[in-house]
Amino acid sequence: MIKAEFLRYSDALVGFSVSGHAGAGEYGHDIVCSAVTSAVMLTANTITDFLYAGADVKIGENKVLLVLKDPDSVMSMAAKQVIASFHKHLEIIAADAKGTIQITVKEVKARKGK
C-alpha cells in the first residue's frame, strides 16, 4: 500500500511524505504506482523548479518527503495550492483503486525560528 501523509499548518497543506507500493500490478507494470510517482515528481518539481518556493526535499529508497521552508512566505502561497491539488489528485486515484493508497493529514506547528 502507498502511504501518503500530508502536513497541515494554519489551515493549509505545507508538505507531504509518500512511500510504499500500491501492489496493483507486477513490479514495473503497476499503473497506480506509476500514477502516484508521476504526480509526486510533478508536484515537487513544480514547487522547486518553477515556483522557486523554498522547500526541504528528501528522496530516498521508495520515499519522498517535501516540506515548505517558510509556509507563510508569498512564494509559498502558490506552492500550498499545488500541494492541495496533489492531495486531491491522490484522493481521486485512491477512490478509483481502492485499497492501494492510504492518505492521512497531520497537524504541524510552525518551524523553529518562526
Cite the ranges covered by each PLM segment.
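N-terminal intrinsically disordered, cationic/polar leader segments
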Residues: 1-29, 41, 45-114
